[in-house]
Design a protein with these regions (language model features):
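Peripheral, non-catalytic segments that deliver or gate enzyme domains
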Residues: 1-237, 242-250, 263-280, 321-324
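A general structural-boundary detector
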Residues: 5, 122, 148, 182, ...
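Hydrophobic/aromatic beta-strand patches that form the interior of the parallel beta-sheet core
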Residues: 19, 136, 226, 256, ...
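Polar/charged alpha-helical tracts
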Residues: 79-82, 216, 253, 385-390, ...
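Glycine-rich His-Gly loop
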Residues: 140, 187, 257-261, 339-342, ...
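Cap/lid segment of the alpha/beta-hydrolase catalytic domain
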Residues: 214-331, 338-339, 366, 371-377
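Active-site-proximal cap/loop segments of hydrolase catalytic domains
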Residues: 287-477
Length: 477
């Protein structure tokens, strides 16, 4: 298709090509329109679905067992954009492969998306029989992993494994054709995970591998989901972690730890940074501020042009929620984050220093006025989406907003000690931004420590570098 990049193909269960997905790479909708085409009997193709960024979308996932219906995720929306059934969070639908008629809404969760609306085809975690055809069930991410079963036998196996590993998440990864052997993983907030083989014929579960067996030697903290309300009335979600030795009624130091992205979200599970902080006596708050994925279309749209503003307030409102529960020593609160989380930490340092005792900004973004907003990660194709969400620096009003919410230009406001960290080989944000931020802190004689690793990029990967990173955290705190 001229001007469009093919991003996926769809076959029926007999291997016959049905259609394909494209992403617009030229024209007025460049970078913001996804389209699905169906092959026609005369060897051509016709447009049957079209989706603009942040609009109501529907994405095919698979043919159903009858090889006539298509299972898909999203909103019930026609090719012209008309919404038949507004569900906000995306739902699992069955549609007629010939007419495109929406036949049934199979499952919907009013609080959580079944898959990220940004990821298109094949984004759901669905369990099919070994030859395809039959859908046993699927999982999606709520406060913890949620599972929906359509096959009683598959459900009984999964629930039996869950009973063996209480307080863990069990994920079946693969299985034999006769459904007698299952490869699965087990993990939790205190366990990074292990792989097992379940042989039903022998009634035996055998460990295959383990991520970090030494973790069991340490007392780690429980990570608990919570919900809170933003100051403008939006229901938001997060996770709170209290130290393993926490005593009820005690007010303790806290670290606010926003995730990166911002088009991402936190999940229940093992988080090395969170456990590091908690085992040093800090409470930790992770929050899915507006703009986080997985909570519906409306919440995503509410984040447009709100970097450093309402998105930032959502982080502080999570802190206030924890304070209302009686957990927080408000005189000893720090904020720590990486990538967009590093931006949020530095924004806090320049706009609301009175709330915090210290700042940890790791591989962060500090200048929103740059034409590419994000540096080397995004090609020209990715910019239109960024401009919708954050603003276009070429637009005078947008530029003003981006400038006013760029920490780089407000270093003189900093009052808290800052640990600022970067990798020289970062390909997702500009290394020069960190250099510029450090120069501004130096110009205003601020209290900061600057760490740069020449062989690391957007997040440290080598074991020695990560060990040194945590040592730097501990020394700084």
């Amino acid at each position: 298709v001229p001007g469009e990049l093919v991003t996926g193909w769809m076959l029926d269960w007999e291997g016959v090509p049905y259609g394909f997905e494209t992403f617009m790479e030229e024209g007025p909708n460049k970078g913001i329109e996804t389209t699905f085409y169906k092959f026609t009997d005369n060897g051509g193709y016709e447009k049957v679905l079209s989706c603009m960024h942040q609009a109501a979308c529907f994405f095919p996932q698979s043919f159903d067992i009858d090889n006539k219906s298509i299972l898909g995720v999203g909103q019930a929306v026609l090719p012209n954009g008309q919404i038949i059934n507004e569900t906000d969070t995306n739902a699992l639908w069955s549609i007629n492969s010939e007419t495109g008629e929406y036949q049934e809404m199979i499952y919907h969760d009013p609080d959580y998306d079944l898959s990220s609306p940004m990821h298109g085809m094949y984004s759901m975690n669905m369990w099919f029989s070994s030859g395809g055809y039959e859908l046993y069930g699927f999982s999606y991410e709520g406060a913890k992993t949620e599972k929906v079963y359509f096959d009683e036998y598959f459900a009984s196996v999964d629930k039996s494994l869950e009973a063996i590993f209480p307080d863990h998440e069990v994920r079946i990864r693969d299985w034999s054709d006769d459904l007698t052997r299952f490869l699965f993983t087990v993990s939790s907030d205190k366990d990074p995970g292990a792989s097992y083989l379940f042989d039903l014929s022998k009634g035996k579960v055998s460990k295959v591998s383990e991520s970090a067996p030494w973790i069991k030697n340490y007392q780690l903290a429980d990570i608990e989901p919570f919900t809170y309300t933003s100051r403008d009335g939006i229901k938001l979600h997060g996770y709170i972690t209290l130290p393993p030795n926490y005593k009820e009624g005690e007010k303790i130091p806290f670290i606010i730890h926003p995730h990166g992205g911002p088009n991402a979200r936190d999940y229940w599970g093992y988080n090395p940074e969170v456990q590091f902080y908690a085992t040093r006596g800090y409470g930790v708050i992770q929050m899915d501020y507006r703009g986080s994925t997985g909570y519906g279309r409306k919440e995503m749209i509410l984040a447009n042009h709100q970097m450093g503003k309402k998105m930032q307030e959502d982080k502080y409102d999570a802190l206030m929620w924890a304070n209302d529960q009686g957990y927080v020593d408000m005189d000893n609160v720090c904020i720590s984050g990486a990538s967009y989380g590093g931006y949020a930490a530095m924004q806090a340092a320049t706009k609301n220093p009175e709330l915090f005792k210290c700042i940890i900004a790791y591989v962060g973004v500090y200048d929103l006025t740059s034409m590419d907003l994000r540096g080397l990660q995004w090609s020209d194709l990715g910019m239109p989406m960024e401009y919708i969400e954050k603003g276009d620096p070429k637009d005078p009003d947008d530029y003003k907003n981006l400038y006013e919410n760029s920490p780089l230009f407000f270093a003189e406001n900093v009052e808290d000690p800052i640990l600022i960290i970067t990798g020289r080989r970062d390909t997702q944000v500009r290394f020069q931004e960190t250099v510029d931020m450090v120069n501004e802190l130096k110009k205003y004689n601020k209290d900061y420590k600057y760490i740069i690793k020449g062989e690391e990029g957007h997040g440290f990967r080598r074991e020695t570098a990560r060990l040194e990173l945590f040592q730097d955290y501990e020394e700084f705190l």
